Amino acid sequence: MNTLVCISHVPDTTAKINFTSDGHSLDATGVQFVINPYDEFGLTKALHLKESLGGTITVLNVGGPETEPTLRKALAIGADQAVRIDAIPSDAITVAQNIKNHISANSYDLIICGQESIDYNGQQVPAMIAALLQLPFTNACVGLD
């Protein structure tokens, strides 16, 4: 089974967050970034499925070069491949369209996304990906056997 796990690069919840002097954006100076915890849960489930069914796990992130440590962490956890789509994740539909384009050009049996990202809490991207690909979708899964 070939599984795609979409991961976000988010500020650690223990980080002290400051804004730029104009108050319009995050000042990332000194902020530790991590794999979105909900996405890490999805990666863990993908690893369990791989243990029982075989296959490969690809992690995918939409972002700039600053997200490379997040992808490397996912590889260290057990993902087989990492893909970074070099784009600014400015809004949910932009992220979803970039992910949809990658999925359309590749072959995956299962696509796993966390239920939401802890930075925006939008819960939009997974549903948008499913709609763009005309695939079935379920959110906030608590089990998968």
Language model: regions and residue ranges:
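N-terminal glycine-rich FAD/FM-binding segment characteristic of electron-transfer flavoproteins
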Residues: 1-145
